[in-house]
Design a protein with these regions (language model features):
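Conserved S-adenosyl-L-methionine
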Residues: 2
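Conserved SAM-binding motif I beta-strand of class I
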Residues: 18-23
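A conserved beta-strand element that flanks and buttresses the S-adenosyl-L-methionine
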Residues: 79
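A short, conserved alpha-helix within the catalytic core of class I
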Residues: 87-101
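Conserved beta-strand signature within the Rossmann-like core of class I S-adenosyl-L-methionine
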Residues: 104-116
Length: 173
């Protein structure tokens, strides 16, 4: 889960925005890298699993910082589209922790998609473990978000999907 083929990453880069694009699938990351190279787009595609990010490495784990340490406060905006349901259903990451991570890596803006557990893709990922997601709702999503973000706007983009624009609250970290 992540940038996938880079549709939004490429669009941002074509507008002159410097992009770091991550996904767990090395094939889509390689494809995005080739496209970005051919078009000379400012995109750094990386293979990263947000649920198990790269740890610090090197002598005494101090030569190279962890992925999350390198990303702390590094981005003006973070897009998490079609990602949250993967982190919840596949990795078991609580909503609150997802928003905490987003607040740690963005300085300003979060664009994030809420996908209801009734969504066909969510149900496919859950594979009969629906009881684990009983408490997931738009209200719970928004409540978890408000600990770190102000909801600026949201738009329904499908029967079970909503995209939110959120502004990071100041002085949370």
């Amino acid at each position: 889960a992540g940038c996938n083929t880079g549709f939004f990453s490429v669009g941002a880069a074509r507008m002159g925005i410097s992009v770091v694009a991550i996904d767990t699938d090395p094939f889509v990351v390689a494809s995005l890298w080739r496209m970005a190279s051919q078009e000379r787009l400012d995109i750094l595609p990386l293979v990263v699993n947000l649920a198990q990010p790269s740890p610090p490495t090197g002598w005494r784990n101090q030569e190279y910082p962890s992925f999350l340490h390198r990303c702390h406060g590094a981005f003006d905006a973070v897009l998490m589209l079609a990602l949250v349901h993967h982190l919840i259903a596949t990795e078991g990451i609580p909503l609150f922790e997802i928003f905490r991570l987003a607040a740690e890596i963005t300085r300003n803006l979060l664009v994030i998609e809420y996908i209801d557990p009734a969504d066909q893709m969510f149900r496919c990922l859950a594979r009969g473990r629906d009881y684990l997601f009983r408490n997931i709702s738009r209200q719970a999503f928004e409540a978890a978000a408000r600990a770190y973000f102000d909801i600026v706007r949201f738009q329904q983009v499908g029967p079970t999907r909503f995209v939110y624009a959120m502004a990071r609250k100041i002085n949370r970290f």
